[in-house]
Amino acid sequence: MKIFDYEDIQLIPNKCIVESRSECDTTVQFGPKAFKLPVVPANMQTVMSEELAHWFAKNDYFYIMHRFDEAARIPFIQKMQKDGLFASISVGVKANEFKFIEELADKQLVPEYITIDIAHGHSDSVIKMIKHIKKYIPKTFVIAGNVGTPEGVRELENAGADATKVGIGPGRVCITKIKTGFGTGGWQLAALNICSKAARKPIIADGGLRTHGDIAKSIRFGASMVMIGSLFAAHEESPGETVELDGKRYKEYFGSASEFQKGEHKNVEGKKMFVEHKGSLKDTLVEMQQDLQSSISYAGGKDLKSLTTVDYVIVRNSIFNGDKD
């Protein structure tokens, strides 16, 4: 098995067939809806808020609301659907979450998307939850994860998941690899590659992206959608406190398994960091789209499909030589 990560790979250009990169189409069909970009902000408290979710849905971007304010989920679904927007929520696998799914069915509330969101998704508890959701609200598009192996993808798909999320601890504020010795940190792109070969349904690549070019690489190695935390954190619209250090503005960004998230120091696999303030999220989304349009033009196509067939070389950490000065 070839092992590599994002910084080890360069995609090889094909002849350009467009006059301008603006002709390149970055839209993606994911589940029941089509979106402007194959990108979704991480469902973390310092990345996604109800206000942002509303804005993303209204502007045809995919979002997944985090699961850390359980009582707010039903009002959130009701508000989104009342406003004619899609509802996309997260659930865990504790006993109360199974009751929550039954409550949704009782109220005839069907969110368009539900993400089963736990760190080690290749587990009996996730399989039970997939089946539970499909029994009570079968029309919901179920995303399950996270996994890091082809076996994990196959099992969750076979249980009824409509998409799987791949990535165990490669994110900037995830320290699973340090705390446990396990994970896809350092070989996330290779993990995506082997998982996508086993998949019959869409995959979300989750974590480890550091640049916009990594979005194109994720699509090349089998992702339909890419989940991004740190690149979306620390914007004007982002949740989280702003601090000033040495005359520069920063925003907090912490992992979902950090003690800041949990409120206690128990089974901690996430950390907190301050990321330099990045301005408007809307500007970042425009830049992401333009960069991805450029990627498509280099791939010699007009849409995302062209990225899936380009050749690549493995260059072992050398692509940033001289770029970080």
Curated annotation (Swiss-Prot):
The keyword Ribonucleoprotein does not apply. InterPro entries: Aldolase_TIM, GMP_reductase, GuaC_type_2, IMP_DH/GMP_Rdtase_CS, IMP_DH_GMPRt. GO terms for cellular component: cytosol; GMP reductase complex. Belongs to the IMPDH/GMPR family. GuaC type 2 subfamily. Its EC number is 1.7.1.7. The active site is at C174 (thioimidate intermediate). NADP(+) binds at residues 203-226. The keyword Oxidoreductase applies. Keywords: NADP, Oxidoreductase. This is GMP reductase. Signal peptide: none annotated. Pfam families: IMPDH. It catalyses: IMP + NH4(+) + NADP(+) = GMP + NADPH + 2 H(+). GO terms for biological process: purine nucleotide metabolic process. GO terms for molecular function: GMP reductase activity.
